[in-house]
Design a protein with these regions (language model features):
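Short acidic-hydrophobic, aromatic-tinged amphipathic segments that line or gate anion-handling sites
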Residues: 1-3, 117-118
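Rossmann-like NAD(P)-binding element
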Residues: 3-38
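Glycine-rich, N-terminal phosphate-binding loop of Rossmann-like dinucleotide-binding domains
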Residues: 16-18, 43, 93
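Rossmann-like NAD(P)(H) cofactor-binding subdomain of soluble oxidoreductases
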Residues: 27-77
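Internal alpha-helical scaffold of NAD(P)-dependent oxidoreductase catalytic cores
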Residues: 83-170
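Interdomain hinge/lid region at the active-site interface
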Residues: 152-222
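A conserved regulatory-domain signal marking ACT and ACT-like small-molecule sensing domains
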Residues: 225-312
Length: 312
C-alpha cells in the first residue's frame, strides 16, 4: 500500500516480504521503476518468483537473491548485525539479466561480508529442499513424535536434553514461514521427501531382516561425507558456537569458568549443565555468540587444564 512514485528514483530495490507477497509488490513496482532499476529479493525459494517476473516482463530488472543465513528465532530482538558474515549469498539471474547488474549485486553482497554464489533458480530450489527444507521438516516431526509417544509422566521430554535438543533445534522455526516455504517449493520438497522415505525404508528393512551391515554402512558413509563439509562458511541452518567441559560437581565450578572467560572479555551466550551426556559430552555446556569467541575460550580453558569436548 505504501508503494508510490518515490520508488521511481530507486536504482536497487530489495523485496524483503514473505515469499507469497512478493509477486503482488512486483506488479505494483512495474509501472513505477525506471528501466535500469535492479530488483532483488531475499526469499528462500526462487522458482515461484522467477515465474512471476517472467509473466510481468521484468526479467531484465530482476535478480533473485537468497542470503543463506538465518536463525530459528524470529523478531527484531533476535537480529544480528553479523548475520551475513562469511555466509553464502545465492544469486539467481534470469536469462535476460544484464551482466553489469549481476556484477553490481555481486559486489554489494561482498560489501555485506557475504560470499556471492550464482546459480539457476530451479537448481537452487532443489538444493535448499535437500539441505534445509527437509531437515527442518524432519526436526519438527521428531519433536512431535516425542510429544505424541511420551507417557503421562513426561519421561521422554525430561531425558530429551542434550543431543536430541541439539539435532531438533531448528524445529523452533516460524510456522508461518515454513508453511509458505512448503507451498512455494512444493515440487522440490516432495521429490526429496520421497527419496528420504525410500532411504528410511531401506534402513527399516535392514533392521527388520537383521542385516547389521545396513546400519554400519549408513553411519560409515554419513560420517565420511559429513566430515568433508566445511565449517568455515555460514549456511542455511545457523551454527552453534559451543563446546562442553568436564567439571566436577562442586560449589563455584561454573562461576570460576565464567570469571576466567569474563576476565578475557569473552562473552557467554548460554551456559548450563548437560544432564543427558550419551554423546560423550562434558557436564557443562557453554555457547558463544561467534566462532572467534568460541575458539578463544577453548584455547584459554585448555591453558587452565580443563578437559574440553568439541563436537565436529
Amino acid at each position: 500500500d505504501d508503494i508510490d512514485t518515490s520508488f521511481s528514483h530507486c536504482d536497487l530495490i530489495f523485496l524483503c516480504t514473505p515469499v507469497e507477497y512478493n509477486a503482488q509488490y512486483l506488479e505494483k513496482l512495474k509501472p513505477i521503476i525506471h528501466s535500469k532499476c535492479i530488483i532483488t529479493d531475499v526469499g528462500s525459494t526462487k522458482s515461484s518468483i522467477h515465474e512471476s517476473v517472467k509473466l510481468l516482463g521484468l526479467e531484465k530488472n530482476f535478480i533473485g537473491g537468497h542470503p543463506m543465513a538465518g536463525s530459528e528465532k524470529t523478531g527484531y530482538e533476535n537480529s544480528d548485525e553479523l548475520l551475513l558474515e562469511n555466509a553464502y549469498y545465492i544469486l539467481t539471474p534470469t536469462k535476460k539479466t544484464r551482466e553489469k547488474d549481476l556484477d553490481t549485486l555481486t559486489a554489494l553482497t561482498k560489501l555485506m561480508g557475504a560470499i556471492p554464489f550464482v546459480m539457476d533458480c530451479a537448481e537452487h530450489d532443489k538444493t535448499v529442499a535437500t539441505i534445509s527444507h527437509l531437515p527442518h521438516l524432519v526436526a519438527a516431526a521428531l519433536v512431535n513424535l516425542v510429544k505424541e509417544t511420551d507417557n503421562s509422566n513426561g519421561v521422554m521430554k525430561q531425558l530429551a536434553a542434550g543431543g536430541f535438543k541439539d539435532i531438533t533445534r531448528i524445529a523452533s522455526s516460524s510456522p508461518i514461514m515454513w508453511e509458505q516455504i512448503c507451498e512455494t517449493n512444493r515440487e522440490a520438497i516432495l521429490k526429496v521427501l520421497d527419496i528420504y522415505l525410500d532411504s528410511l525404508k531401506k534402513i527399516r528393512d535392514g533392521i527388520k531382516n537383521n542385516i547389521p551391515s545396513t546400519v554400519y554402512q549408513l553411519f560409515e558413509e554419513s560420517r565420511s561425507y559429513r566430515n568433508s563439509i566445511s565449517d568455515n562458511v555460514r549456511g542455511l541452518i545457523s551454527a552453534q558456537y559451543s563446546f562442553s567441559v568436564q567439571v566436577a560437581d562442586r560449589p563455584g565450578s561454573i562461576s570460576i569458568i565464567s570469571a576466567i572467560l569474563a576476565a578475557n572479555s569473552i562473552s557467554i551466550k548460554n551456559i548450563g549443565i548437560n544432564h543427558n551426556r550419551e554423546l560423550g559430552e562434558g557436564a557443562l555446556r557453554i555457547a558463544f555468540y561467534g566462532v572467534e569467541d568460541c575458539h578463544m575460550a577453548v584455547k584459554l580453558l585448555k591453558s587452565y587444564h580443563y578437559n574440553i569436548i568439541e563436537r565436529g
